[in-house]
Amino acid sequence: MKHLWKYIAGALAFALPVASCSDDNTSDFPDKEWGELTAPVLTVSEEEITLDANKADREALKFSWTAASVVTRSSSVEYDLYLNIEGEDLFKGIKREWGGEADLTISFTHEELNDLIITTFGGKSGERFAFRACVYAHTDNYLIEDKTSEEVAFAATAYAAEVVKPASLWM
């Protein structure tokens, strides 16, 4: 009886590793190739712009890009515009989400761009800033790899400060 238990334990010790190492036919996650997203192509309306306080509500810059087409089942593509000064990490700057309009554009007025230079990037009046921008296309489907457009460069000069002198000085 003592030897019988040894034979049973030996058979189990041999059978369990053999059974656990058998071929496992569980399916893997689908390959990312089945859903491919093309990178958008970004363009900017002006490469050099001097902002003007008299045109504060007019469009100063317009970013437009091509649609990032998806070769897959129904997945909607969302876009984010990233903007930062030259020499800094592009994705740590300003992020503006695309609103879902029919045309793939984001615009800045003279006032918006001037406020961005002064408040966000710490610029001074009359100072020229060189910027870089890109568009990041992504979907809600984790199997589709996100794509980023090539960077575009442009420069903007903030409003020159207006010096208002009083008509007369009072003492």
Feature locations, PLM:
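Alpha-helical transmembrane segments
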Residues: 11-15
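C-terminal motif of bacterial Sec signal peptides marking the signal peptidase cleavage site
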Residues: 16-20
